[in-house]
């Protein structure tokens, strides 16, 4: 890493790079004579400068924020892409974003006045789903949706298009040896006030459902109050969706336990 004097010298030359787990950044000394804008204007200018260049490399610019950290600003850039963003992708996006900002300064369009640190990172797991592409990338994940009237629905994303998404919604608790009952629910994005992906420590496996020719209700028809369950009132339950295996019962109705040392089934 070098001595403190070496680090200070390199910082003055604008060549210090900072790379951390899950994010990459570059620290640069900038002249305080750069363009002075309000914070909202800086964000807009940064987004305009970065979005197209990142898109050409296959990245979606999800967010840009500018905050103060002591004598510097921190420019935080959030990127995503289909298939997810790993550390190598974050490093690539960081280099590209730094080059784009360097080019802006060379053109006399310094976007952030004074020294700043550039941080590039991927979205958090619980980031809001605000674009169709967010829903597409959340297929297979459990989400919680709140509509504009404050009513809540929870389900697993099965598919998504430009106007909405189809969820598998549990309607009854799982029975031993049987998967929980589920119904298809259609979520229309125009009705959604907020939607987030839920963190799961042990996610169940779900097979694809066939939703062709199924008349799915609107979000307002299937949303439930917190603590309640929804019964969408059409079709048979999708019991072919696997759940964690339950215990089996033998012929006389007693629950079958583990087998003994000799392989004989033990009952309780």
UniProtKB/Swiss-Prot annotation:
Residues 1-41, 223-268 are annotated as: Disordered. One of its GO terms (cellular component) is cytosol. Residues 32-41 have a biased composition (Low complexity). One of its GO terms (biological process) is translation. It holds the Pfam family RimP_N. Belongs to the RimP family. Required for maturation of 30S ribosomal subunits. This is Ribosome maturation factor RimP. It comes from Frankia casuarinae (strain DSM 45818 / CECT 9043 / HFP020203 / CcI3).
């Amino acid at each position: 890493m070098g001595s403190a004097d070496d680090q200070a010298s390199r910082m003055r030359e604008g060549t210090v790079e900072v790379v951390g787990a899950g994010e990459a950044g570059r620290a640069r000394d900038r002249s305080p004579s750069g363009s002075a804008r309000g914070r909202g204007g800086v964000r807009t200018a940064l987004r305009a400068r970065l979005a197209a260049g990142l898109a050409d490399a296959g990245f979606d610019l999800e967010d840009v924020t500018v905050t103060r950290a002591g004598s510097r600003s921190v420019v935080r850039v959030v990127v995503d892409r289909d298939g997810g963003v790993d550390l190598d992708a974050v490093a690539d996006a960081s280099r590209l974003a730094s080059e784009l900002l360097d080019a802006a300064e060379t053109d006399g369009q310094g976007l952030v006045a004074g020294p700043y640190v550039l941080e590039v990172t991927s979205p958090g797991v619980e980031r809001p789903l605000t674009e169709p592409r967010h829903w597409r990338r959340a297929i297979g994940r459990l989400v919680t949706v709140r509509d504009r009237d404050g009513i809540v629905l929870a389900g697993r994303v099965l598919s998504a298009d430009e106007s909405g998404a189809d969820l598998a919604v549990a309607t009854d608790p799982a029975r031993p040896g049987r998967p929980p009952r589920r119904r298809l629910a259609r979520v229309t994005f125009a009705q959604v006030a907020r939607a987030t992906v839920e963190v799961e420590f042990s996610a169940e496996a779900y097979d694809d459902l066939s939703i062709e020719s199924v008349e799915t209700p609107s979000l307002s028809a299937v949303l439930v109050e917190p603590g309640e369950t929804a019964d969408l009132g059409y079709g048979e339950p999708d019991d072919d969706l696997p759940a964690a295996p339950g215990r089996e019962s033998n012929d006389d109705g007693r629950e079958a336990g583990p087998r003994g040392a000799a392989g004989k089934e033990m009952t309780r």
